[in-house]
């Protein structure tokens, strides 16, 4: 039994829209009593923040290391989709995340991945079947059916997709959505299937349409996709249906802040603080039925102390009544984590990346900085002895996807807006199947960047052709077994090297990791070829 203790401060009662000085008595991890006081206090007591949709693997940290950083920013819980590791290791990967997360006080709430592999147009390392989903959802540790990315399968009544939705309905667990740009009759059909959220809205009219028809919209601000500024104007009217999430956040950005930064930005825009805090603290708990306290008598003492309601500097974070962080320092103990992986290929040759073509007019993937969507650019390249060569002056570079699960030919196409003038950058974090993706100026540099990752069985790399830097990610080729600070330092060095090579993207490795994500339009590349994400068919390189 824990010793009772008290916490005093200006209590922010979000539901009652009131702030008053109070003394909380914490007993056995829960709020036993809340007593009003007469004198105002200098600090504020809030419910802890909840990230309503995040892939922990994108931080390149295992859950326990993610938790050590997140709690310093006032995060007490996450709604986490483990489909990244599931694409590599199947349900073994899901349980790896759950078991690792249980070693931490942070309340990780994992979902059952709904689309592994994401499509049939790529090669993943594993499959999560409907039977697997049923077993996962039968477990109390699995809270929901994770994002249904196969929106064509939903709106065209694919039996296998409907079966998964039915399993979630029978289990009484919510279904997360993923339908970027979907509006009108197609969106209505998607919503009618019981899919309740979408974190992929990138247009205000799209988000408004979905909100009007009953969906919950989660405002995303990650390392690559940043939708806060676009969607924030909807908060005043629709705050009861909205939440905040990071989705995919690299370690350097996570060290800077988490959901607390979105709260601060929203309040700075003049949005009512109670509306903002309802999105950050209350709505995810209620929507997903999380076992997370919201500062009510009898709740778990999952709360934070902040200095004011403008900056939201986190002084202390409590989870189940335990202090897990104080003034930027965490109190979470970790232990070495076992290595799991799925990497089955040998080293490549520069000739593996050669691309024979007969035409010089081609379809090019056009990257949009700060977005996961791409455009189709009508580009022109040169041919040398029948082989396509990049046009560095026009910023049209080679992009290749290397299947890491079996020895098959490399898929190569062209991409614009990475800005590299020399060298190459590569990643085994390549949503969602997590093959190796690489962008570069020459076949030799591309091959060097890829081989550096094959040798390490996963990671991120950058090369100028003579010098190569690598951030190893030995756990599933997605996560490090080192601390957030070490990973962030190595990652920042790689980003700086990418910029030295010419990249002008805000987050070149995060953007690179989404260039093989076929379920987000318009043009992407899988290990099987160039893909039209709007028509959901393969696309010729030559025009």
Task: Give a label for each model feature.
Residues 67-174, 470-472:
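Divalent-metal coordination cores built from histidine and acidic residues
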Residues 46-53, 80-83, 111, 146-148, ...:
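Active-site neighborhood of phospho(di)ester-bond hydrolases with catalytic His/Asp-centered motifs
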Residues 82-85, 113-114, 150, 180-181, ...:
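Short, ordered loop/turn segments at secondary-structure junctions
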């Amino acid at each position: 039994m824990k010793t009772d203790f008290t916490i005093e401060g200006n209590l922010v009662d979000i539901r009652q829209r009131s702030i008053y000085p109070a003394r909380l008595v914490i007993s056995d991890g829960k709020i036993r009593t809340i007593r009003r006081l007469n004198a105002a206090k200098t600090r504020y007591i809030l419910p802890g923040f909840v990230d309503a949709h995040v892939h922990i693997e994108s931080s390149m940290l295992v859950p326990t290391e993610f938790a050590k950083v997140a709690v310093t920013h006032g995060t007490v819980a996450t709604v986490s989709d483990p489909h990244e590791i599931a694409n590599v290791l199947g349900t073994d990967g899901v349980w790896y995340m759950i078991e690792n997360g249980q070693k931490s006080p942070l309340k990780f709430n994992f979902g059952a991945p709904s689309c592994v592999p994401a499509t049939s147009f790529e090669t993943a390392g594993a499959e999560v079947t409907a039977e697997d989903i049923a077993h996962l959802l039968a477990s109390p540790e699995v809270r929901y059916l994770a994002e249904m990315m196969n929106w064509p399968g939903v709106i065209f009544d694919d039996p296998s997709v409907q079966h998964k939705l039915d399993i979630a309905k029978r289990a009484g667990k919510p279904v997360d959505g993923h339908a970027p740009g979907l509006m009108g009759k197609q969106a209505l059909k998607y919503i009618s299937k019981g899919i309740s959220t979408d974190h992929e809205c990138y247009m205000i009219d799209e988000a408004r349409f979905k909100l009007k028809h009953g969906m919950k919209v989660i405002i995303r601000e990650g390392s690559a996709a940043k939708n806060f500024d676009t969607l924030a104007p909807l908060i005043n009217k629709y705050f009861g249906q909205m939440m905040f999430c990071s989705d995919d956040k690299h370690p350097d950005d996570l060290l800077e802040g988490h959901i607390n930064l979105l709260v601060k930005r929203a309040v700075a825009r003049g949005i009512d603080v109670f509306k903002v805090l309802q999105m950050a603290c209350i709505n995810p708990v209620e929507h997903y039925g999380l076992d997370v306290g919201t500062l009510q008598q009898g709740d778990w003492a999952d709360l934070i102390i902040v200095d004011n309601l403008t900056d939201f500097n986190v002084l202390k974070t409590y989870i189940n009544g335990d202090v897990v962080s104080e003034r930027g320092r965490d109190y979470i103990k970790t232990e070495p984590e076992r290595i799991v992986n799925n990497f089955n290929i040998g080293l490549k040759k520069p000739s593996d990346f050669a691309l024979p073509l007969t035409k010089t007019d081609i379809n090019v993937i056009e990257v949009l900085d700060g977005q996961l969507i791409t455009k189709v650019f009508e580009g022109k390249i040169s041919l040398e002895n029948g082989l396509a060569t990049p046009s560095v002056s026009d910023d049209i570079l080679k992009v290749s996807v290397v299947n890491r699960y079996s020895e098959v030919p490399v898929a190569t196409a062209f991409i614009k807006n990475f800005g590299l003038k020399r060298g190459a950058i590569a990643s085994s974090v390549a949503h969602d199947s997590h093959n190796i993706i690489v962008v570069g100026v020459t076949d030799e540099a591309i091959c060097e960047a890829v081989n550096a990752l094959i040798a390490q069985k996963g990671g991120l790399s950058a090369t100028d052709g003579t010098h190569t830097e690598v951030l190893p990610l030995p756990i599933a080729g997605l996560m490090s077994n080192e601390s957030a600070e070490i990973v962030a330092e190595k990652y920042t060095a790689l980003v700086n090297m990418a910029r030295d090579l010419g990249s002008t993207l805000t987050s070149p490795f995060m953007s690179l990791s989404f260039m093989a994500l076929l379920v987000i339009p318009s043009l992407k590349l899988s290990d099987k070829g160039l893909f039209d994400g709007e028509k959901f068919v393969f696309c010729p390189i030559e025009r």
